[in-house]
Amino acid sequence: RLSPSEERKSGYYDWLVKRHMAKLNARYIGRLHSSGFYLWANKKADKLSDLKGLKMRTGSLYDRFMRALGMVPVTMNSPEVHTALERGVVDGFGWPNMGPRQRGWIKKAKYVIDLPFFGASNVVALMNLDKWNGLSKASQDKIIAITEKYEPGMVAHFKSGAAAEWKKLDAAGVVRYTFSDAVNKQYLDMAYDLEWKNLAKKVPGDVDTLRRITGN
């Protein structure tokens, strides 16, 4: 839930650098994109239980959350979604706010739960570690400095773009909605708690550190 600048201050950025070196032989440089994710469907849910049984185009990002909500995740490539919505193969999808209008998906799935989750996009800049180590210290420092300077403007750019896109979505008839404060919290807590449980299985020794440096 941290901004890229906050990640650098908290120690999470340094953790990512070490992790990518150890696991991928890559130098983590920084984030290139910032966006929340949403669940879109062909009907409005008055309560969380109304989401049960909905067939949703998914990706690894959404799978656990959708299953916990009682949805039925359906894996398919994004070019197939439009036809799948028209034929009733899926009732909705998980996606940021940028894209569904352009792809025509909102014609069949115009209801979106306006509670963004996982705001830190996984679109990041990496460099092969051997290539990175072949650069001069001055070049390395310059790359990091440029990226660090770029990130706040990048976040502002995507926030502005998202706000502009919501205006177009509203005009196109998209219905944004939430639940009660208590249910909104339950919804978002579920999304994050599931990922923490998954991390506890994958990297049990790192979870306490990750919670501390991410403020979660």
Which positions does each model-derived feature cover?
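N-terminal secretory/targeting leader peptides
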Residues: 1-3, 14-216
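Active-site-proximal, glycine-rich beta->alpha crossover segments in alpha/beta enzymes
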Residues: 7
